[in-house]
Structures are given as C-alpha cells and as structure tokens.
Curated annotation (Swiss-Prot):
This is Uncharacterized protein MJ0904. It is found in: Membrane. The chain crosses the membrane at residues 175-195. GO terms for cellular component: membrane. The keyword Membrane applies. It comes from Methanocaldococcus jannaschii (strain ATCC 43067 / DSM 2661 / JAL-1 / JCM 10045 / NBRC 100440). Keywords: Membrane, Transmembrane, Transmembrane helix. It comes from the Archaea. It is a single-pass membrane protein. Its main location: membrane.
C-alpha cells in the first residue's frame, strides 16, 4: 500500500492524493487527515476522514484545507493514512500509518500558494496511541521495533528449540530408564534364584 500523486490545488483549496492497495487481498478501511506545519509548529489540522479501498485498486483522497489565514512562508503539508489493526506486534494488533509530505510557499498577504517541492519517500509509522494529538512516532522507533521483534522471534525460536531438545532428552531418559529398569529387575530375579 502506498501514497502517490500528492498535490495541493490552491484554486480549490484541496489536497489530493491517490492510495493504492496492490498486495492485500482484503478490503482495507483507512482513515486519513492532514497537518500543515512550519518548523515544529502545527498551524492547521484537518478533520479525520474515512474510506475503504478494495484489493488491487486505487482511490483518490481529497482533503479540503483552509489556509487563507497563514502568513507568508514555506509550509509543509503532511498527509497521514492510517490502517487500524494492520500488523501484529507482541501479540497485539497495531495500526500502521503512512505519511507523505509536500512543501508549499505562501506569497504575500494575498495568500497565493505554490507547490514548492514534493518529498518522494513514503514513511511508515508504527502507532499504538489512539489520540489524534499523538499520531506520529519517529521512524527510528519503527526500526527499533523491528530490531526488538527480530530479537523476540530469535529468542522464541531458541526457547522452542531448547524445549524440543529437553523433551527429546527426557524421552530418551525415560526410554533408557525403562530399559535399565527392565534389565535391573531381570538381574535381581536371577540373583534371588541363585543367591
């Protein structure tokens, strides 16, 4: 799943993008919203919208924006697309958030907006909080989660292997114990007859 063709239309004050569901054979319910920021300050948050995307299809997302009150400068418009219960992490279902940004320049008091550049990379963010305020996590957290997940999987595999070896050892000990017990009883019977 990915975000494509992210563009801001200044004449109609909307942000448009396409989202594709190429690989997942199920319908995906997605939520999407936009933040407009400059530096670390967020100047605008849109409402959260929801739509459904079908397997092997794409859907156009349209988010209306109200940016007329912003001062001159360069702003980042970031589109977030969230799929709830998408992944399983530590035996809990967690959402995945796709994030894509563009920069626009607002010129003068007229509020004329021009698309400055398009950041080409999509970012995938692992999200566990349900609040809109805390919807983003650094991409470093995702890579740490992947490292932790691989460590957990590796540790689990070692524990399972150890348990299997312990069980085989216990089975071998019980078989050997039965055989030695059988021969021991024969030897004690012989000694009791001739002894």
């Amino acid at each position: 799943m990915n975000i494509e063709n992210l563009a801001y239309n200044s004449s109609s004050d909307v942000l448009k993008a396409k989202i594709k569901n190429d690989k997942f054979p199920v319908n995906l319910t997605v939520q999407y919203w936009v933040d407009v920021s400059r530096g670390s300050n967020i100047y605008y948050k849109s409402s959260i919208f929801q739509t459904e995307i079908y397997p092997k299809s794409e859907k156009e997302l349209i988010v209306p924006l109200t940016l007329g009150d912003l001062e001159s400068g360069i702003y980042n418009i970031t589109l977030y697309v969230r799929v709830n219960n998408f992944a399983l992490f530590n035996y809990q279902k967690v959402p995945v958030i796709l994030k894509k940004s563009i920069s626009i320049e607002i010129n003068g008091s007229k509020g004329v907006m021009q698309q400055k550049s398009n950041k080409e990379s999509d970012e995938i963010i692992n999200e566990t909080s349900e609040t809109h305020k805390n919807m983003t996590i650094d991409i470093k957290n995702l890579s740490n989660n992947k490292d932790n997940k691989s460590n957990i999987e590796e540790s689990t595999a070692k524990n399972v292997k150890s348990n299997i070896e312990t069980k085989k050892s216990a089975d071998n000990n019980s078989i050997l114990g039965k055989i030695s017990g059988f021969f021991g009883s024969i030897v004690s019977t012989i000694f009791s007859l001739f002894g």
